[in-house]
């Protein structure tokens, strides 16, 4: 979100307040945006005693506050960071870290909601490719963004046993 948190956004319920402009990718075209949608849905279910109608109303109110619905996560990050649109960006942790650390540490801050989804995308390593490119690191290979997050000290990522080889 914008530095200083001028709209006082601390959790999912703050995103449905009037006057809050949300940026998130379209869950119909972005895999990551589906996790955003499901995290909001899970929060709404939990805080409404599993009442699906109330959860649907919550998610509908959230998406009414979405100013730009980009087709993908990086597009939403660009809309928020480069175009300056929106009060808050709903994003995967790596996109939030990219915005804060690489594109404007003095302009953004990260707020972690009380509830979210733990998504653990799989990573495949093609030995011939990593050997040829010299990208194999420390007995295993991780995506560059994961390494960036680890260096920043903000990553809560856990490595699965299969990723520790």
Question: What residue ranges belong to the model's regions?
Answer:
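Soluble non-cytosolic domains of exported or imported proteins
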Residues: 6, 27-34, 53, 71, ...
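A conserved helix-loop-strand patch within extracytoplasmic ligand-binding domains
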Residues: 1-46
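Extracellular/periplasmic juxtamembrane helices and adjacent flexible linkers that interface
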Residues: 130-165
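Extracellular/periplasmic catalytic domains that process cell-envelope and extracellular macromolecules
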Residues: 14-17, 31, 81-84, 102-104, ...
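Solvent-exposed, polar/charged alpha-helical surfaces in well-ordered, non-transmembrane soluble domains
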Residues: 13, 38, 42, 60, ...
């Amino acid at each position: 979100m914008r530095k200083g948190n001028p709209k006082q956004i601390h959790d999912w319920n703050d995103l449905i307040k009037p006057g809050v402009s949300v940026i998130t990718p379209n869950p119909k075209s972005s895999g990551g945006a589906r996790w955003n949608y499901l995290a909001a849905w899970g929060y709404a279910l939990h805080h409404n005693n599993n009442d699906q109608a109330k959860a649907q109303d919550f998610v509908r109110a959230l998406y009414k506050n979405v100013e730009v619905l980009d087709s993908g996560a990086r597009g939403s990050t660009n809309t928020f960071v480069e175009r300056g649109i929106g009060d808050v960006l709903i994003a995967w942790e790596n996109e939030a870290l990219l915005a804060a650390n690489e594109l404007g540490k003095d302009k953004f801050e990260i707020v972690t909601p009380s509830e979210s989804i733990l998504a653990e995308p799989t990573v495949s390593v093609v030995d011939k490719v990593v050997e040829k490119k010299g990208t194999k690191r420390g007995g295993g290979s991780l995506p560059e963004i994961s390494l960036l997050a680890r260096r920043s000290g903000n990553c809560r990522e856990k490595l699965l046993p299969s990723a520790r080889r």
